[in-house]
Regions:
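Basic, amphipathic alpha-helical/coil surface patches used to engage anionic, phosphate-bearing ligands
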Residues: 1-221
């Protein structure tokens, strides 16, 4: 199956509610796939695939309630969110949509969520979460959010052969290996910036010495 890249977002008329849900399903924005190293289900989310200009909050929430939430089961699970190539003009859902999705998640699912692995975070995403994370999400979710700068560190937590990752994510990961200064904002990743900034609070602490590229964001209480 080819999961390289969806067509670029364009200003098209809003689809019917049913067609919006079909579009989300076709693009495989959300997909329950594989397990983490603890044997728990993984919900993979590809940010680049999200058709932000073509779907409503209602369509997204209905899709999640009908297709995703029931299939997560009654056991703990993790989320792998691939942020590669997400931008405000095409596929960023916006504050209202993020809040709507969060509010629609059943409390039992929020309790069973073990970790959100945020792959390839950039400057804008970190600043956004540092600024609005406290307003959008409860502190419990913030504590479960872990930044992953390279795919190699994701595979320390998730079974590699069980989770599909689009080719453009691997391409960007390889580019970061050859241009490491992009992580720290010292080199441009034209046409999109890939830089590093501290997580939600001003202090940054590593989870442990062996897991140097994954950070846990702590929201301000």
């Amino acid at each position: 199956m080819n999961i390289s890249s969806p067509p670029p977002a364009t200003a098209t008329p809003r689809l019917s509610l049913t067609d919006q849900q079909h579009l989300i399903d076709k693009l495989e924005v959300f997909k329950i796939q594989g397990r983490d190293k603890h044997g728990q289900k993984v919900l993979r989310i590809v940010g680049k695939f999200f058709p932000a200009r073509r779907v409503s909050n209602e369509a997204v929430n209905n899709y999640l309630e009908e297709k995703i939430f029931p299939n997560l089961g009654e056991r703990p699970f993790s989320v792998v969110y691939l942020h590669t190539d997400v931008n405000r003009s095409g596929n960023f859902p916006g504050i209202s949509t993020l809040r709507s999705i969060y509010d629609a998640i059943p409390i039992t699912l929020k309790d069973r969520l073990q970790a959100v692995y945020f792959v390839h975070p950039g400057l804008q995403a970190r600043l956004f979460l540092a600024t609005f994370g406290r307003l959008l999400f409860k502190s419990g979710l913030c504590k479960k959010l872990k930044y992953v700068k390279r795919l190699e560190f994701l595979w320390d937590q998730v079974r590699r052969n069980e989770v599909e990752v689009p080719e453009f994510v691997y391409d960007h990961d390889e580019e970061l290996e050859y241009r490491p200064m992009m992580d720290y904002g010292l080199e441009s990743d034209h046409p999109r910036p890939r830089v590093y900034v501290a997580p939600c609070t001003s202090s940054t602490s590593m989870m442990d010495s062996s897991f140097v590229s994954m950070y846990s964001m702590r929201c301000i209480a």
